[in-house]
């Protein structure tokens, strides 16, 4: 490979000796060999290429032919070259960046300087190739065309001299093409390496943080997609302007030589316009910077919308989110329009400036009555057209440089923001696993605080984000002794105060406390996620962590449990059994190879939590940090997991168990009670009970809650539970959870359950794959875009403006030829001696003013058409992208939940980030250049055909080769683009998943390299075609030059000059036109991918609705009736609710119980019509809910979800997004949910910021805010889906009482695992396998010893 070898991490070998020049540049030097017949068979053919193969992209020919013959996939492409891999390049870039930081410090470190060092040798080689190319490009149009035209004027001229000049012209053009291709060959690999190096480095830096406090997922997606591509384009285009000074000096000198001082007028036009372009680029950069900030916000909001879509639908908040996103999009569009106007002006400058320079130069020359001949005039035109290159490349280069500058600044912020040094130390005693001595910790670290403006410090101090942990442990309800923010000094706000305890090897430490008391923060402190202010935190041994909200990534169950570990059959089976997953896995369609949706969407909360626990158990670590892992499972499963997993399997391991289920603390070796971030009590369970302090009171409260109702209600269950033998009890308890017909196989379960899976497992069971066929550009794609841009008339008008602008430039040159011909005839006359007169001289007395005014007017018209074109084109393209954005968003918004279960969020985010960036910025840029170049090619061919009709025969013969090449190229490049598009979505999914699970993983595999090498092939394919096109055009140039030479006086010299000046442009212009056309079509792939959603997304409400079927005050009572109701999540999947016939009276409170996966949450989805019934229906107050609009239905119901959801915004926005309630009402509900004191402590009160995922509040506090949100809705029917699972018993009781009081007279459905939350219900509904097996009053069911409810109750009593 020509250029520097960024294959080596340093100049030293493994022994520390400096590598020789030959060793360092060995791969590059081998590529300099013209032909390498005996090259080694490298995995990637580019590594075996010699100079000719490398420069002409011949190494790619087999791939192009294969793409023509068959469909390309990731597997059929050659593997990535090791020299282009992300690993190799990122390591080298890391070394250079570290050196820069060490030299000048992180703040002064220049990322652009490191980028230059990373690729400077390659860039210099590229510039050398470009200079050679530009010299050849200048010699042909200036020297040779002038000589050829002069030769045609000499009647005594020798033919062989003319032919020799034509051959020389062909040779210079061919050499130009070769060096141009070589420059791009170097460029593409340079750009690829820079892109992968920085993308990988940024990603590695992000995952090195244990928690992200400074960047959102939306910003990460934007940086790793749009910003990394900006760097790719910068590496391609930024070296090109280095050739401009050489080109300008060469052309200026020759123009002065043949034209005289007036040539300086044209040169000065170019010189003046270059700083104008620089200014416009700066302006464009400023608008782009502002737009990127708004784009980040839109992508972040979209990510939040897609992540929380279930709750948004259940609350009917679609309008609120639609308004938010549309408002952001409107702001983004305004900024993009401003950037688009500037960019469009820059793109139009190239043809405009060359026309202005030509017209002004020749007009002034004539006004000064200087001699002007056709050879001189058209040599000057040809020369100025070559100089047009300097203006033509500047928009690309300046745009790329400006965007790269913005991108580098954003990336630098990430690279210099180092993860704070670990405060974790090793305890001196090897038997001590955990040691905290007077440890005080905070979530904010000193560096970030110092860099924060003073006026924001107070707010930032309280709004620091965290990952899956509880912040603000001081804000527990009731908040005794907590100091408000206004009472804080400049010192950092501590969250954990003076924590001291020791845990020995093999012990179980139980941690309890109220919501927000600091339990999760304590685990975060042990993980090193917080900031130590004073004291010591010592940890010994390897860690496993189970977060409070389970993190599940897209894959199958087994992959989630193994998490990259080797599969050990015995260990795996044991882990599955002790985590109570055997039954769940046997019920899944493909066992443990069943595909899981993103974030575990197709699993219940309990299943997600136990898979997360199984991951920890299988990892076989020394220390286990378990954050409330049993809150989401029923009593029987909870007891099994605690006994079999925590007490037995983890025996000998050290376990720190945070729990709200206090009954498990009795089995812990030591218990810590936290309050306000401090250890309130500490000791064994027995010691703490004897002290009769807060802990003892909590335990007594728990027992009181269980037995405060009439004792006979539970005595029967207790007697039944204890009169049987242990074995019988286990068997009976097990019967509850076995599916019908499975009892006889129960004894075999440990054996047969070991596989959990059929031998044939479909590759994609749940998540629909993005087929390579998706994104194929058809006429429908263009039709969709044209309709979105305002229709066919507006589109035709826009294209017509391009025609007028380019036509004005062509007309000016044609008019000049006409003028020169007229002057020639007037001067020489029919009788004149042609050898004695000034051929083509334009005299002052032949009506020059008419010709001159028309000639000048053509320039003015071109300016007018150019400005109008830029305005209309920018408006039209942004209208199209905004219309498509809104249409796709609306379609996705109205899609059913099954769509979101089967479509990865990463794929949807790809559409709204990368694809929208393509539509907003890159498609207009490439389309505008393509249309300009296309009409230039058309006018050139028309003029050539008019001057030399015979050239059409040559064009026809060359067209055959052109179409063969085009067919191979088009098929091949389309296949490559599809592979690139399809491979991009998993990368987005991977980024999103990694950012969400950052508290659990600190490093994850990278897929960037695989996407990047598809990009390399795609771009190399463009150059493969371009080179071969240029060779064909050179043959055409040679033919036209011969015709000019051999035609002598049969055609006027001005016509010959006009045809030669144009044909010399066609050589490079046609291939650029085809390339930009292909790029434009490739960008239209994004339109097609969006069109797929527009055409295929089916709205969730497919039933015809009757207008006015919803009574005004409905529902007035809240009676719910299920009639023969059946439901399945998707077609061809098993029923999850089967033949439900159920009547719930108005005002009743119904507790819904059953083991994990029994259908409890599905009942809620049916009620909200998140899934339409397979058969049967549901009546509420005798109204069939299936004939109501979804908005009417869902606004009348309220849900408090299992996983608390808060949105980015303010506290007020989260409670009341439509602002339909007063502040007083909001404070009232906060008071009733014990959150008033917490919110009052925040500087902005109700307007206080809520960060991404609500992570500046603890999980319990988030749930309390969700309860407050529900209280505001004032519904007659309330669904509590495990609503208090994340709360301690005391807060749970308070909230339950609040709910009971606030929703008096309402129908309340409570889904719960902890039976104490349903004991006071009017009725209990027991679910199993999607069926109702019991529905009665709790006392009635408890008195039946064989009832399923009694057995569940007995299992909990035994705990």
Curated annotation (Swiss-Prot):
Carbohydrate attachment residues: 405, 438, 540, 981
Disordered: annotated segments: 446-491
Any single GO CC term annotated in Swiss-Prot or TrEMBL for this entry: endoplasmic reticulum membrane
Membrane topology value: Multi-pass membrane protein
Transmembrane regions listed in the UniProt entry: 125-145, 159-179, 231-251, 256-276, 348-368, 376-396, 791-811, 853-873, 934-954, 1031-1051
Domain of life: Eukaryota
Binding-site list for ATP 1: 513-520
ABC transporter domain boundaries: 467-701, 1120-1354
Listed Basic residues bias regions: 451-466
PROSITE patterns (alphabetical): ABC_TM1F, ABC_TRANSPORTER_1, ABC_TRANSPORTER_2
Signal peptide positions on this chain: none
Alphabetic keyword roster: ATP-binding, Endoplasmic reticulum, Glycoprotein, Membrane, Nucleotide-binding, Repeat, Transmembrane, Transmembrane helix, Transport
GO molecular function annotations of the record: ABC-type transporter activity; ATP binding; ATP hydrolysis activity; ATPase-coupled transmembrane transporter activity
Binding site for ATP 2: 1154-1161
Gene Ontology biological-process entries: transmembrane transport
InterPro entries (UniProt xref): AAA+_ATPase, ABC1_TM_dom, ABC1_TM_sf, ABC_transporter-like_ATP-bd, ABC_transporter-like_CS, ABC_transporter_C-like, P-loop_NTPase
Stated role: Probable transporter, its substrate specificity is unknown.
Protein name: ATP-binding cassette sub-family C member 12
């Amino acid at each position: 490979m020509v250029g520097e070898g960024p294959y080596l991490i340093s100049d030293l070998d493994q022994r520390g000796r400096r590598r020789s020049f030959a060793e360092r540049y060995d791969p590059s030097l081998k590529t300099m060999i013209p032909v390498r017949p005996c090259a080694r068979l490298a995995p990637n053919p580019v590594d075996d290429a010699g100079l000719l193969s490398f420069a002409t992209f011949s190494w790619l020919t087999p791939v192009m032919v294969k793409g023509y013959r068959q469909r390309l996939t990731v597997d059929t492409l050659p593997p990535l070259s090791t020299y282009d891999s992300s690993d190799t390049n990122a390591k080298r870039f890391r070394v250079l960046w570290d050196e820069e930081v060490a030299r000048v410090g992180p703040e002064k470190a220049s990322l652009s300087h490191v980028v230059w060092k990373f690729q400077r040798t390659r860039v210099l080689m590229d510039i050398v190739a470009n200079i050679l190319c530009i010299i050849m490009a200048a010699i042909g149009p200036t020297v040779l065309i002038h000589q050829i035209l002069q030769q045609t004027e000499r009647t005594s001229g020798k033919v062989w001299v003319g032919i020799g000049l034509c051959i020389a012209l062909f040779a210079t053009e061919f050499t130009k093409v070769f060096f141009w291709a070589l420059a791009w060959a170097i460029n593409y690999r340079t750009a690829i390496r820079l892109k992968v190096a920085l993308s990988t480095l940024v990603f590695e830096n992000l995952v090195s943080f244990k928690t992200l406090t400074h960047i959102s997922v939306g910003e990460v997606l934007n940086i790793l997609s749009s910003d990394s591509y900006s760097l790719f384009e910068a590496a391609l285009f930024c070296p090109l302007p280095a050739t401009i000074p050489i080109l300008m000096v060469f052309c200026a000198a020759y123009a002065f030589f043949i034209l005289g001082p007036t040539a300086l007028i044209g040169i000065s036009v170019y010189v003046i316009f270059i700083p104008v372009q620089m200014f416009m680029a700066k302006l464009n950069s400023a608008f782009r910077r502002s737009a990127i900030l708004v784009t980040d916000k839109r992508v972040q909001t979209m990510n939040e919308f897609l992540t929380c879509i279930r709750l948004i639908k259940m609350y009917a908040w679609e309008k609120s989110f639609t308004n938010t996103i549309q408002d952001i999009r409107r702001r983004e569009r305004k900024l993009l329009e401003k950037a688009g106007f500037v960019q469009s002006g820059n793109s139009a400058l190239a043809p405009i400036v060359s026309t202005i320079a030509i017209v002004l130069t020749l007009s002034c020359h004539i006004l000064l009555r200087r001699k002007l001949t056709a050879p001189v005039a058209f040599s000057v035109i040809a020369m100025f057209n070559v100089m047009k290159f300097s203006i033509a490349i500047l928009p690309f280069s300046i745009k790329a440089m400006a965007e790269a500058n913005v991108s580098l600044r954003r990336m630098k912020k990430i690279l210099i923001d180092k993860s704070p040094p670990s405060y974790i130390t090793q305890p001196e005693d090897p038997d001590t696993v955990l040691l905290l001595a007077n440890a005080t910790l905070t979530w904010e670290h000193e560096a970030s605080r110092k860099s924060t403006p003073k006026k924001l410090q107070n707010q930032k101090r309280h709004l620091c984000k965290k990952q899956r942990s509880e912040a603000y442990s001081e804000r527990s309800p009731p908040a005794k002794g907590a100091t408000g923010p206004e009472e804080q000094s400049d010192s950092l706000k501590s969250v954990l105060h003076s924590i001291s305890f020791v845990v020995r090897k093999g012990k179980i430490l139980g941690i309890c406390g109220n919501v927000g008391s600091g339990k999760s923060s304590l685990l975060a402190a042990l993980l090193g996620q917080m900031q130590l202010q004073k004291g010591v935190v010592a940890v010994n041994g390897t860690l496993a962590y189970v977060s409070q909200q389970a993190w599940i990534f897209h894959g199958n169950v087994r992959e989630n449990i193994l998490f990259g570990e080797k599969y050990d059959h015995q260990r795996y089976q044991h882990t599955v059994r002790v985590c109570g997953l055997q039954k769940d896995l046997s019920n899944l369609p493909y066992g443990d190879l069943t595909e899981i949706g993103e974030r575990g969407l197709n699993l219940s909360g309990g299943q997600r939590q136990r898979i997360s626990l199984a991951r920890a158990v299988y990892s076989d670590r020394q220390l286990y940090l378990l954050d409330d892992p049993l809150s989401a499972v029923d009593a029987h499963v909870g007891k099994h997991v605690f006994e079999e997993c925590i007490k037995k399997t983890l025996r000998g391991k050290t376990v720190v168990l945070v729990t709200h289920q206090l009954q498990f603390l009795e089995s812990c070796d030591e218990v810590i009670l936290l309050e306000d971030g401090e250890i309130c009590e500490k000791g064994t369970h027995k010691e703490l009970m004897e002290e009769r302090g807060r802990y003892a009171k909590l335990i007594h409260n728990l027992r009181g809650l269980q037995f405060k109702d009439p004792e006979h209600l539970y005595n029967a269950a207790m007697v039944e539970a204890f009169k049987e033998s242990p074995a019988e009890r286990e068997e009976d308890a097990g019967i509850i959870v076995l599916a019908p017909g499975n009892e006889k196989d129960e004894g075999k379960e440990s054996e047969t359950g070991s596989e959990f899976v059929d031998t044939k497992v479909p590759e994609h069971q749940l998540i629909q794959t993005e087929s390579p066929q998706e994104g194929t550009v058809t006429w429908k794609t263009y039709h969709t875009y044209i309709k979105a841009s305002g229709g066919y008339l507006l589109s035709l008008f826009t294209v017509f403006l391009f025609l007028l602008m380019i036509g004005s430039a062509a007309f000016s040159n044609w008019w000049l030829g006409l003028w020169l011909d007229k002057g020639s005839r007037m001067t020489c006359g029919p009788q004149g001696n042609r050898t004695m007169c000034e051929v083509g001289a334009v005299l002052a007395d032949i009506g020059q003013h008419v010709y001159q005014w028309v000639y000048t007017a053509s320039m003015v018209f071109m300016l007018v058409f150019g400005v109008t074109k830029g305005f209309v084109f920018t408006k039209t393209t942004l209208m199209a992208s905004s219309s498509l954005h809104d249409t796709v968003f609306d379609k996705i918004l109205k899609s059913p939940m099954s769509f979101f279960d089967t479509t990865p969020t990463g794929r949807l985010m790809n559409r709204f980030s990368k694809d929208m960036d393509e539509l907003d910025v890159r498609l207009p840029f490439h389309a505008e250049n393509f249309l300009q170049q296309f009409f230039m090619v058309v006018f050139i061919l028309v003029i050539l055909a008019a001057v030399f009709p015979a050239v059409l025969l040559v064009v026809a013969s060359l067209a055959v080769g052109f179409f063969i090449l085009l067919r191979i190229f088009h098929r091949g490049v389309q296949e490559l683009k599809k592979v690139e598009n399809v491979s991009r979505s998993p990368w987005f999914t991977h980024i999103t998943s990694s950012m969400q699970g950052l508290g659990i993983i600190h490093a994850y595999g990278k897929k960037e390299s695989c996407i990047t090498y598809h990009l390399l092939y795609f771009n190399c394919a463009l150059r493969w075609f371009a080179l071969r096109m240029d060779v064909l055009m050179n043959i055409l140039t040679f033919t036209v030059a011969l015709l000019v030479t051999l035609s002598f006086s049969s055609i006027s010299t001005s016509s010959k000059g006009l045809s030669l000046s144009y044909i010399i442009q066609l050589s490079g212009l046609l291939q650029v036109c085809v390339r930009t056309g292909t790029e434009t079509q490739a960008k239209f792939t994004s339109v097609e991918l969006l069109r797929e959603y527009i055409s295929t997304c089916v709205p969730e409400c497919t039933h015809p609705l009757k207008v006015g079927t919803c009574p005004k005050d409905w529902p007035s009572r809240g009676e719910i009736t299920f009639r023969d109701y059946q439901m399945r999540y998707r077609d061809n999947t098993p029923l999850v609710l089967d033949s439900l016939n159920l009547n719930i009276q108005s005002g009743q409170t119904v507790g819904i119980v059953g083991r994990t996966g029994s259908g409890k949450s599905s009942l809620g989805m049916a009620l909200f019509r998140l899934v339409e019934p397979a058969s049967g229906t549901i009546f509420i107050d005798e109204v069939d809910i299936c004939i109501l609009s979804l908005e009417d239905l869902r606004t009348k119901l309220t849900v408090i979800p299992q996983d608390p959801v808060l949105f980015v915004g303010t506290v007020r926005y989260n409670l009341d997004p439509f602002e339909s309630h007063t502040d007083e009402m909001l404070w009232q509900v906060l008071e009733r949910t014990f959150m008033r004191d917490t919110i009052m402590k925040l500087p902005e009160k109700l307007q206080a910021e809520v960060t991404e995922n609500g992570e500046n509040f603890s999980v319990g506090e988030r749930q309390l805010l969700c309860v407050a949100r529900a209280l505001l809705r004032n519904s007659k029917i309330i669904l509590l889906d495990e609503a208090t699972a994340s709360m301690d018993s005391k807060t749970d009781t308070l909230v339950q009482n609040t709910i009971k009081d606030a929703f008096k007279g309402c129908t309340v459905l409570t889904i719960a695992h902890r039976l104490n939350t349903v004991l006071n219900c009017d009725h209990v509904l027991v679910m199993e396998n999607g069926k109702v097996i019991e529905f009665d009053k709790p006392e009635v069911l408890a008195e039946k010893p064989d009832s399923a409810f009694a057995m569940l109750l007995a299992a909990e009593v035994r705990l």
